[in-house]
């Protein structure tokens, strides 16, 4: 596995266990205003990722598709489906939601929030100009087409 964890250290005698200290990490901007991330685990080859996500009040994750199963645990705030088949679905603190491969929606955080999100491969974000990108604004097919998962 080619996974990395920024600022992680191997623990004791087990070099295969990695401790991550998110409090020591800086929030990284995503390509979406008001959406921030701390990558707890990221495999640049497969796209496998676990991210601590922070959303400013009113932040929107635009139209996107979950290429594989996505899992989210809400620590604070609310995650609301703004558009899509589950429009109005609200996930609050202490709640967990997982979404099936191929599910597509627009999400927002009316009051902001902090969540842990787990991805098997990055989501596809659909832009009005026809572009399809990952969360960092990279062309999805160029960045993740090699995974064969989308």
Name each model feature, range by range.
Residues 57, 66-84:
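Glycine- and acidic-residue-biased ligand/ion/polar-headgroup-sensing regions
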Residues 1-47, 131-150:
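A short, N-terminal "cap"/entry segment at the start of jelly-roll beta-barrel domains
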Residues 34, 38-41, 46-66, 91, ...:
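Conserved short histidine dyad/triad with adjacent acidic residue
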Residues 82-104:
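Short acidic-glycine-tyrosine-enriched beta hairpin
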Residues 101-126:
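Ligand-binding loop in jelly-roll beta-barrel domains
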Residues 53-55, 74-79, 93, 107, ...:
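Short, well-ordered beta-strand segments in beta-rich or mixed alpha/beta enzyme
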Residues 48, 70, 112:
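Conserved catalytic motifs of the protein kinase core domain
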